[in-house]
Structure formats: C-alpha cells, structure tokens
Amino acid sequence: MCIRDRDNPEVILESVDKLRQKMEENAAIDDKFLDENFEQIANNSNIPFMGSNKPKVTIIEFFDYNCGYCKKSLDAITELLRSEYDLKVSFRDYPILAPSSRTAAKAALAAKLQGKYFALHSALMNMQGNLNDEKIYEAASYLKIDLNKLKKDMQKINIEEILLENEELARKLNIRGTPTFIINGKIYAGALELSKLKTIIEESMNDS
C-alpha cells in the first residue's frame, strides 16, 4: 500500500518542526526591525495620535473601522488617555476587512486636514454593523465636516501613501489582523482589555 507523505507521522512532525523554526526566525527578524525602527515608526508626523509629545509609553494601534474588536478597544484606549499615565497613542489605519474599510480610513485621514480626525474616528468606531459610503459621509456631515473638501482630500496621493506605508509596515512586522498593538516596542496581537493594557503599561514603565 502506498502512503502519502502527508499521512506519514514522521513527515508531519518534520513539517511542523520546520514551520516552528521558520516562525521563530521570522519573529526574530520582526523584533530586530522593530528595535531598529521603533522611534521613527512611533514619531511619524503623518500619523494621527493623541496624548503626550514626550511620552513614557507609546502605543501604536493597527486597526480597521469594520473590526468589531477594534471598536471594543476604543473605550479602553479612551480611558487610558484620561488616566494618569504619560501616554502617546498613535493610530495606524490598516484597512483589510472590506472596501469600505479603506473608504473610512481615507475619510478619517482627510478629516484630519479639517481638524476633525478624532471626531470622525470616534464616530466611525461607534457605528454598529458594517460601514458603507452612506454611513461614512452621514457621520462626517453630522460633524459639520465639509464633504466636498473631504471627498477631494480623500483622493490626495499622500493619504494613499499613508495607507500603503501602514500596509508595508504591517507586512514587515508580520501583522496579519486587527487590532494589533505595539507598546514600547513590543507587539501584542488581538484585543486587549483595559486591565491588561494597564498591566503592560506599568511593566513597560518599570522596565524603562
């Protein structure tokens, strides 16, 4: 009887070992890249942020406006910014879930040019269900954002470049989903509750 390699336990174990080794090698590369480039990544003037200009702890969030777990994280992030921690939270749009994710990301970045990024960001994050163009522009209109200017600014090459940079950065860091947080140079994949975020922040401050 012929046995296919994939049915051979020894071959399967060998494949698993190779995969594990490859993942460890990739993680080492990711860590090295992040160590060497964290300051530049954290302080990119094109990326919207809230908090201190000279923080003790920097949080970078990769998010998607259609991501339910990202929406849940908004409350925790907002609460952290109200706390006594000396923080900076940098928001990296990573629109991977739907075409409307990219539209929403462009709209928020364009709203930044009218001083309304965080207002629109919060409105989009608090919306229930999947986004569409109508919902996005209704939210912008409600916030008294100039829609004609917004739509023109959404087409600007520098806004597309921000999204492409975020996507390239996510690729280099092996970030595959949202939300993903980078906290003082360490990557945390998935949603983090407020208590967990506080623990990570306090440990990071003690280490610095």
Task: Please place each PLM-identified region on the residue numbering.
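Extracytoplasmic thiol/disulfide redox context detector
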Residues: 4-99, 152-177, 202-208
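Cysteine-centric redox/oxidoreductase cores and disulfide-bonded domains
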Residues: 95-178, 182-208
